[in-house]
Amino acid sequence: MGISSSNPFSSIFKSKAIKLLMLGLDGSGKTTILYKLMLNEVVSTISTLGYNVETIQHKHLNLTLWDLAGEERIRTLWKPFYNKCTAIIFVVDSSDRLRIDEAASELAKLMKEEELKGCSLLIFATKQDCISPMEIPELTDQLGLHDIKDRRWYVQPTRTLEGIGIYEGLDWLSTKIIEDRKSKSFKSKFSFSNKSKQQKSNSQPNTPRKNIQMMT
């Protein structure tokens, strides 16, 4: 006989992997972050030509991270990966002011994609240990983040080589995923309960009303 959990949200933590897309321009540090999370060490990388995919566990969630190549000629191939995406990690080189407009343009395109509608957005501002990186307020303005109204977003500064900021950003994203799943689970249970009550009400026979005469 199986064991039944009394926690109504226990299904949230089942083993089914949650798909996250890790996107951004080439050289922004996506692959370095991926393998820092996967191996807890910094590995030498070259620009990704297609994609890397790894699954990690964080806050009881199985997260499958898809690190897609960021070269301009390859970005047009991102779209087939959008299906069933739960959240987006957009990686920006905070030391590269020459390409920040290009990064902002790519992010704006992503925000218009129907398949990514509602996906929480985590921005990793990498290379904060470089000389004169963009601070978070400047980066927020440059990326036009205040114009994003249809989803939750968060900017996390990182120093990947030291592992600073990566897990904090993933904490935020995991918390939002859990909150979303709890909300969907509650709405589903509430809808089912109301439907059951309605069906029960409809199945009851109509009882004829008795005429009651008032005594005067």
UniProtKB/Swiss-Prot annotation:
Biased composition annotated in UniProt, kind: Low complexity: 188-204
Annotated compartments: Golgi apparatus
Segments for region (Disordered): 188-216
InterPro entries reported in the protein's UniProt record: P-loop_NTPase, Small_GTP-bd, Small_GTPase_ARF, Small_GTPase_ARF/SAR
Compositionally biased region (Polar residues): 205-216
Main localization category: Golgi
Sorted UniProt keywords: Golgi apparatus, GTP-binding, Nucleotide-binding, Protein transport, Transport
One cellular-component annotation, GO: Golgi apparatus
Stated family: Belongs to the small GTPase superfamily. Arf family.
UniProt-recorded name of the protein: ADP-ribosylation factor D
